[in-house]
Amino acid sequence: MPWRLPTGHQLCRLCLLRKPRPALKIKPSSACVTYGTDSQSDKENKRTVEKLSACSVDIRKIRRLKGWVLLEEETYVEEIANILKELGANKTVIASILERCPEAIICSPAAVNTKRKLWQMVCKNEAELVQLIEQFPESFFTVKNQENQKLNVQFFQELGLRNVVISRFLTTASSIFHNPVENNKQMIGVLQESYLNLGGSEANAKVWLLKLLSQNPFIVLHSPRAVGETLKCLQGQGFTDSEVLQLLSKLKGFLFQLQPGSIQNSISFTKTTFECTDYDLRQLVVKCPALLCYPASVLEERIQALLKEGISIAQIRESPMVLELTPQIIQYRIRKLNSLGYGIKDGHLASLNGTKKEFEANFSKMQAKQGRPLFNPVASLKVEE
């Protein structure tokens, strides 16, 4: 039987048979408005949405990133915006801060004002404070343990750290301020004592400590026990106090993140691979502390990648810093050097080392040198009469 479209009479019968859908019921509410989606219906605080919109905040961004904030019953949009405005932030900056850190609106104004006073302890002026808040809003609007944070700021100031360094800690290493101030003091004392026990001078102890802390503030989060175990492990491997102190300074305190077992495995692998004496091994590690940081499996992978490029073990031993680079970076740099006719197999590996910026700068110099004429046609010739 051929297929046919239903007639108008048949369509009417179908419509009568179909059960009508119930009308959508919306409960009136002064506190929230309902937004329907395919998967769920989120109840948002209408007053919060309206106040954020009045601040020129893109509500869509908040819904996409941290929509839960809009569900909170108690918010302080106007109060937080006013605090930022009092500091000198314009409307655009305020909107940007609230879009990227919408949880700011659930912080009590009193807590935010306390945090404001805390950050003002290390900022030169309010303009600098606003700039920091704009760059790191989440750090500023984390308002727990404020009294402990204040004690830590005062401790670091008494220790001799500059305010610009402390402000950097507040924004990028805020966890150290939540650490009990007694713990931070204890760890600083352990580091200073370790420095002196390893042969460091009393006169240079404070300078060394402040430099170490500014390079790696997270070092205070380690336990004194971990420090003792790491130092004991290195000394057990034959490293002298002077060599351990060099490693501690070069690794900027990251040395204490290494487990004794991992250190022993890396040292054993290095000694076997390079077939060196205990003394040569220690010199190699001091020259390239990364040999301690990477697991034996990573070191082996990188050595094999270098060998495939025709580089010898002797070359690697002469310039071990090359092991700080991944195989992909090594391959890329070798190709670039080969494009200049530089035979890495026969040369020194130092040209491969360094950061990306350093390598590119050296490569540009080599490139310029290669294109330079053998003589300067403009310079006058010295002719003997």
UniProtKB/Swiss-Prot annotation:
Keyword Transmembrane helix: no
Subcellular location: Mitochondrion matrix, Mitochondrion nucleoid
Domain of life: Eukaryota
Presequence range in chain numbering: 1-35
GO biological process, one term: regulation of DNA-templated transcription
Keyword Lipid metabolism: no
Cited InterPro entries: MTERF, MTERF_sf
GO MF assignments: DNA binding; double-stranded DNA binding
SMART domains attached to this UniProt entry: Mterf
Keywords of the record: Mitochondrion, Mitochondrion nucleoid, Transcription, Transcription regulation, Transit peptide
A GO cellular component entry from the record: mitochondrion
Pfam families on file: mTERF (PF02536)
Family statement drawn from the similarity comment of this UniProt entry: Belongs to the mTERF family.
Subunit structure: Monomer.
Functional description taken from the UniProt entry: Binds mitochondrial DNA and plays a role in the regulation of transcription of mitochondrial mRNA and rRNA species.
PANTHER family xrefs: TRANSCRIPTION TERMINATION FACTOR 2, MITOCHONDRIAL, TRANSCRIPTION TERMINATION FACTOR, MITOCHONDRIAL
Designated name of the protein: Transcription termination factor 2, mitochondrial
